[in-house]
């Protein structure tokens, strides 16, 4: 069991202002009557906490790796990309399978070009897969697809007239 003096000191150190009793009459006169006006004490160990995302805007400079990664991500794709078309299932075969396209173009341009080469009607469907794995969105950049999924410096686009993969 705790002694009365230790109980009083723990009450005086309590964060709850209702439990805290003034140690002297003079202290009670010096305190403001409203505890809400009291200033919040500074936190000495707050500097050890990791930065939050909202605090990261305060940084004056980025680490070199992060700066380079952001510069690479913001770079506009320039130059040409080699695209190799591979037919799947019963899709017609192109005479020439390798073409070059500007890296700044959207994947929609690749699909429209392929439809034109295959002499497709407006009602015919052409489904394109990158590396026979996934069908990219039409608004994906060709340069970004090439950077991420190239094989032997070519973007491999498999195509089919019907869905080939589940």
Curated annotation (Swiss-Prot):
Bias class Low complexity marks the residues at 1-18
- What subcellular compartments does it reside in? Preautophagosomal structure membrane
Position(s), cross-link Glycyl lysine isopeptide (Gly-Lys) (interchain with K-261 in ATG5) = 166
Instruction: Tell me which Gene Ontology terms the entry assigns under biological process.
Output: autophagosome assembly; autophagosome maturation; autophagy of mitochondrion; glycophagy; piecemeal microautophagy of the nucleus; protein transport
- The ranges of region (Disordered) come to 1-47
Q: Report the CDD domains cross-referenced here.
A: Ubl_ATG12
Task: State one molecular function term (GO).
Answer: protein tag activity
Output a single Gene Ontology CC term carried by this record: Atg12-Atg5-Atg16 complex
Q: How does it sit in the membrane?
A: Peripheral membrane protein
Keyword terms: Autophagy, Isopeptide bond, Membrane, Protein transport, Transport, Ubl conjugation pathway
Give the top-rank taxon of the lineage listed in the UniProt record for this protein: Eukaryota
Main localization (coarse)? membrane
Note the Gene3D superfamilies from the entry: Phosphatidylinositol 3-kinase Catalytic Subunit, Chain A, domain 1 (3.10.20.90)
Residues crossing the lipid bilayer are none
Provide the family line: Belongs to the ATG12 family.
Assembly, in brief, is: Forms a conjugate with atg5.
**PANTHER family in the record, alphabetically?**
AUTOPHAGY PROTEIN 12, UBIQUITIN-LIKE PROTEIN ATG12
Q: What does this protein do?
A: Ubiquitin-like protein involved in cytoplasm to vacuole transport (Cvt), autophagy vesicles formation, mitophagy, and nucleophagy. Conjugation with atg5 through a ubiquitin-like conjugating system involving also atg7 as an E1-like activating enzyme and atg10 as an E2-like conjugating enzyme, is essential for its function. The atg12-atg5 conjugate functions as an E3-like enzyme which is required for lipidation of atg8 and atg8 association to the vesicle membranes.
UniProt name for this protein: Ubiquitin-like protein ATG12
